UniProtKB/Swiss-Prot annotation:
Localization, UniProt: Forespore outer membrane
A Pfam family hit: Beta-lactamase
Protein name per Swiss-Prot or TrEMBL: Penicillin-binding protein 4*
Annotated source species: Bacillus subtilis (strain 168)
GO BP term (any one): peptidoglycan biosynthetic process
Active site residues of this protein: 61
Topology within the bilayer: Peripheral membrane protein
Record-linked InterPro entries: Bact_CellWall_Synth/Modif, Beta-lactam-related, Beta-lactam/transpept-like, Peptidase_S12_Pab87-rel_C
Gene name per UniProt: pbpE
Amino acid sequence: MKQNKRKHLQTLFETLGEKHQFNGTVLAAEGGDILYHHSFGYAEMTEKRPLKTNSLFELASLSKPFTALGIILLEEKGILGYEDKVDRWLPGFPYQGVTIRHLLNHTSGLPDYMGWFFANWDSHKIAVNQDIVDMLMNEGLSGYFEPNEGWMYSNTGYVLLAVIIEKASGMSYADFIKTSIFLPAGMNETRVYNRRLSPERIDHYAYGYVYDVHSETYVLPDELEETNYVVYLDGIQGDGTVNSVTSDLFRFDQALYQDDFISKASKESAFSPVRLNNGETIDYGFGWVLQNSPEKGRIVSHSGGWPGYSTMMIRYIDHRKTLIYLSNKEEDTEYEQAILKAAEHILFGQPYDVPERPADKKKKAIDTAIYSRYVGSYLLQDGTAAQVTTENERLYLEIAGQLRLELFPSSETRFFLRALSVEVEFTLGEDAAKSFILYEDGSEEEAVRTK
């Protein structure tokens, strides 16, 4: 049976690899045995340096399970508690009632640091965790909701968890995670790595690449205006910046089954859903997305996405099956989900299809003079403000609290966004656009011009 699954996994990924439709490393395992482990494509495109199974990837938000586990281990030692208020560890913290549990569960309601940094940060400086703390302490930003009144994925919360780990342990976040998690699990290649803040030459490093619509080539995100925030946000830890290899992640997966690595009680807490004040449950634990499937049992997983990197670890814990997917070339999200779904079907002996990669998006040549008719202020149906601007014969959309993104023409009135399943279509009046429709993941929302 395992041999048959191995053969199908090989067929799936070699088909994709031969057509240059997958650039990354994948590992599939069952019952503690690795069924398939292979790399395709390049670790460094300009040098044509191939990826290998020991290539080191930025995990992005797949770092969050490690940050959460750091907190869990400190709780097991009695050094901190899940119900500790954040102001116990950060005196003067202005968001009252927020606990460590809220940070772990994404129920704190804290403001998102990325939107503020996009708008206010000096991009010539690399931010570190203390800059996030200073923002929260000094900027008077409103939270989204009172603690545990709602659920919103929060990078801010996981940065604060890293800060709390440092204060509670007396060690740097990187050193604590290394000595408490990486080394005990045998993850000798894994590290917290801020590549631009503290660069090292790592021969087996997998550089991440993003698609440049203008040149129709893949480039480092540092070189592209709308992704170069990877430079000035590079010093932030806790929500990302763990770097690892597939074999180490498999060792981590196996260690999580051992009660001497993390206790049964702690695993029960980590893999339990959030319960909000109104009684609603959310399928997120302590750094893990939770699912229950009639066929596949309990599933705990986490993904990561950062310019140039897409990562996923899926643990089918009732069946001791594991999928680990690390990619360093930007791809359509739905396409990557189709790859993972095919691999999952193989692991469970189900029929599967080899997905077809969508073509890279190409812009249409139009007269950019028409852009002036689209420039203005708009209001989305949910009350969010949006600005359409033009600069150097390029058109941009900026939704309040988000990064300014370039709009690429597919016609004179319809535009697409790079690397997102989002399109914008303007409705023209006599002299200027009256509104636009925002199409995203099968839904649509109108934005009406206000100025």
